């Protein structure tokens, strides 16, 4: 699935985007070349084996005989019980429940064009503090997060027959829904609700010079649009939402 990872250091470059403060990390994925599948499970004892970390992963790839279309699916399920190292009733490592599922597919519409679509869903639950089997507001100290994340993307690539021109048009979106609790002393006003919708669309054009001045070079240009809508609320005992600035 992953062909290589590129790490570029240093910020302030238009090639990295506005959110890349100290550089960027590019994860270059590869297309599946054959039908395959893998299922794995690991069980890890934490500390004195009073807590266990269970992790199950699954991935599979399907490719047509002419290799014009392919599909890669993946999934993960993880459960780790809370770990209390010094037996004081409070966890040093939180309780975790994670599920991830997604796929990436491609279809080569012609010799020089390709359409790529991907989707992923992540569900995560974290709970730390004490009295993990009780609601968070009944604990002396509790930190609890529950995320539901859905994201996907669509990309169209064109490569010229002489390999000098390359055009990519892409768009992606992700929606995050988070329920949280940060508080102590059985506080009923420490519940929070956060929703976030991020959308991005753009295009990139690359022209390859056989020789520019004294060496081969690439000219890269593009345009990108980003939109991020975040709403963060705290719930009170009266049901009134306090809306901080976002």
Question: What do these predicted ranges mean?
Answer:
Residues 80-100, 106-108, 112-167, 173-198:
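Flexible loop and strand-edge segments within Gram-negative outer membrane beta-barrel domains
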Residues 32-36, 64-69, 111-114, 160-166, ...:
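Short loop/turn motifs that connect adjacent beta-strands in outer-membrane beta-barrel proteins
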Residues 37-41, 71-75, 103-105, 113, ...:
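Membrane-embedded beta-strand positions of outer-membrane beta-barrel proteins
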Residues 1-2, 7, 19-43, 54-59:
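N-terminal periplasmic accessory domains that precede
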Residues 43-47, 64-66, 77-81, 121-125, ...:
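Transmembrane beta-strands of outer-membrane beta-barrel pores
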Residues 23, 37, 43, 54-58, ...:
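Hydrophobic, lipid-facing positions within transmembrane beta-strands of outer-membrane proteins
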Residues 17, 48-52, 63, 93-97, ...:
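Short sequence motifs at beta-strands and strand-loop junctions characteristic
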Residues 145-148, 173, 177-179, 186-246:
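Outer-membrane beta-barrel transmembrane domain signature of Gram-negative proteins
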């Amino acid at each position: 699935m992953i062909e290589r990872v590129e790490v570029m250091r240093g910020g302030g470059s238009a090639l990295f985007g506005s959110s890349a403060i100290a550089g960027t990390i590019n994860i270059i994925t590869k297309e599946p070349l054959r039908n395959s599948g893998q299922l794995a499970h690991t069980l890890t004892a934490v500390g004195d084996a009073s807590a266990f970390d269970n992790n199950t992963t699954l991935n599979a790839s399907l490719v047509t005989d002419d290799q014009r279309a392919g599909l890669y699916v993946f999934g993960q399920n993880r459960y780790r019980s809370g770990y209390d190292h010094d037996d004081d009733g409070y966890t040093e490592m939180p309780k975790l429940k994670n599920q991830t599922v997604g796929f990436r597919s491609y279809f080569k519409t012609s010799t020089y064009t390709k359409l790529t679509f991907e989707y992923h869903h992540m569900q995560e639950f974290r709970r730390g503090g004490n009295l993990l089997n009780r609601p968070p507001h009944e604990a002396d100290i509790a930190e609890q997060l529950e995320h539901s994340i859905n994201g996907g993307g669509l990309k169209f690539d064109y490569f010229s027959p002489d390999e000098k021109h390359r055009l990519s048009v892409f768009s992606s979106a992700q929606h995050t829904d988070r329920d949280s609790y940060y508080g102590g002393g059985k506080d009923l006003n420490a519940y929070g609700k956060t929703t976030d919708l991020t959308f991005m669309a753009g295009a990139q054009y690359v022209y390859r010079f056989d020789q520019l001045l004294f060496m081969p070079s690439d000219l890269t240009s593009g345009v990108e649009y980003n939109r991020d809508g975040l709403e963060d609320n705290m719930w009170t005992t009266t049901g009134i939402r306090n809306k901080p600035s976002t």
